[in-house]
Amino acid sequence: MALDTEKIIEELKGASILELNDLVKAIEDEFDVTAAAPVAAAGAAGAAEAKSSFDVELTEAGQEKVKVIKVVRDITGLGLKDSKDLVDGAPKNVKEGVSEDEANDIKAKLEEVGATVTLK
């Protein structure tokens, strides 16, 4: 039995919306499928987008802790004690939600004085 797609479409053109809705439901039940568009595809596309904000994490202070504390003070505007606590408590975020350029700039400044930095 060959199906003629054009004949089927012509028959469907004469059907009412209610009849077409019943037909869709019957096809879904018979073949165990759904007429809904897949939602997972939208999530996958969102994951591929470029990241717009970064967190700069001080992973390790390195050998020149005093220099790292000075750079952290300059970057964050924190006081000496707070900057020292941040460096001593590594790994900790130095800055959060910054642009890629700013994150790379901060990373370069910290690495220049011997710190290990991770961008997240």
Curated annotation (Swiss-Prot):
Signal peptide: none
Molecular function as annotated in GO: mRNA binding; structural constituent of ribosome
Cellular component terms (Gene Ontology): cytosolic large ribosomal subunit
UniProt keyword Glycoprotein present: no
InterPro entries per the UniProt record, alphabetical: Ribosomal_bL12, Ribosomal_bL12_C, Ribosomal_bL12_C/ClpS-like, Ribosomal_bL12_oligo, Ribosomal_bL12_oligo_N_sf
HAMAP family, sorted: Ribosomal_bL12
PANTHER family: 39S RIBOSOMAL PROTEIN L12, LARGE RIBOSOMAL SUBUNIT PROTEIN BL12M
Record-given protein name: Large ribosomal subunit protein bL12
Organism of origin: Lactobacillus acidophilus (strain ATCC 700396 / NCK56 / N2 / NCFM)
